[in-house]
Amino acid sequence: MNEDDCKIRRGNAAELFSGIRHIAINILTNDKVFKAGLRRKMRKAAMDRNYLASVLAGSGLS
């Protein structure tokens, strides 16, 4: 997720954003609909809104 290139440095923002990244990784890891690696799942979620909606609906966050 390119954490090294991230420019978030104000207050607790870096820690909060790290937590959000961790949640996103857990959601994609637990997805069983699309059998692929984490990087491919991230790309598919970024490009396909239907897949993103199904991942969020499956995690209970939508």
Curated annotation (Swiss-Prot):
InterPro entries: Transposase_11-like. It comes from the Bacteria. PANTHER family: H REPEAT-ASSOCIATED PREDICTED TRANSPOSASE, PROTEIN YBFL-RELATED. This is Putative uncharacterized protein YafF. It comes from Escherichia coli O157:H7. The gene is yafF.
